[in-house]
Regions:
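Active-site helix-to-loop segments that bind/position phosphate- or nucleotide-bearing substrates
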Residues: 1-68
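Long, amphipathic alpha-helical coupling/dimerization segments that relay conformational signals between
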Residues: 61-114
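Compositionally biased, low-complexity/repeat regions
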Residues: 1-30, 95-183
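Residue-level preference for alpha-helix termini and adjacent loops
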Residues: 35, 48, 70-73, 104, ...
Length: 183
């Protein structure tokens, strides 16, 4: 499966830095605003493994479902590694300018609407630059792709820590009712 993934993947990323005020219409929801507290600007990021991975997943699913599940899991890890590498490059660039980044915060996290996905792709010119689009239902295509917003500040920032204390579902969470967490 790893060989298939390596042959099919064409990892690409695009990022744009923007003043927070300039992209405020796309920062909808309390969770993203909390995440960006203390940040005067943002970096928009999109990463994809490319359409070749989608084709490999379709082919695997048609012939061997167990293999397709393994390939899908490997591709999920690979796109996160691609995003991690892009984020580290951005961190290094910002550090040279005396700036610091929060972690990634993606559409669909907390109350940050997934519908923002299409706007982020447009702002990044992602369809042209890396071949990344979204369906009318705001799902990314190719599937193994990530979009995110990172905050930029002149001092170390961490954003709001993920976890039960900051979760919008805290009061009705099925995990918490069972004494567990999703962390």
């Amino acid at each position: 499966a790893e060989r298939t993934l390596r042959a099919a993947a064409g990892p690409r990323a695009v990022a744009v830095r923007a003043a927070r005020d300039d992209i405020s219409p796309y920062l909808q929801g309390n969770d993203i605003l909390r995440h960006l507290e203390g940040c005067g600007s943002c970096v928009l990021l999109a990463c994809t493994l490319g359409a070749g991975v989608d084709a490999a997943l379709r082919a695997a699913g048609a012939s061997d479902m167990a293999y397709a599940v393994v390939l899908d899991a490997l591709a999920s890890v690979a796109v996160e590694q691609t995003a991690d590498a892009a984020e580290q490059t951005l961190r290094n660039e910002e550090r040279e300018e005396g700036q610091f980044l929060t972690g990634r915060f993606s559409p669909g996290y907390g109350d940050y609407p997934i519908a923002v996905q299409n706007d982020l792709l447009r702002l990044l010119d992602a369809p042209r630059k890396i071949g990344l689009c979204a369906t009318p239902a705001h799902l990314l295509t190719p599937r193994k792709s990530v979009t995110a917003v990172l905050g930029v500040a002149g001092h170390p920032v961490t954003g709001r820590r993920a976890g039960c204390a900051n979760c919008a579902l805290r009061e009705r969470c099925a995990y918490r009712k069972e004494g567990k967490t999703c962390e």
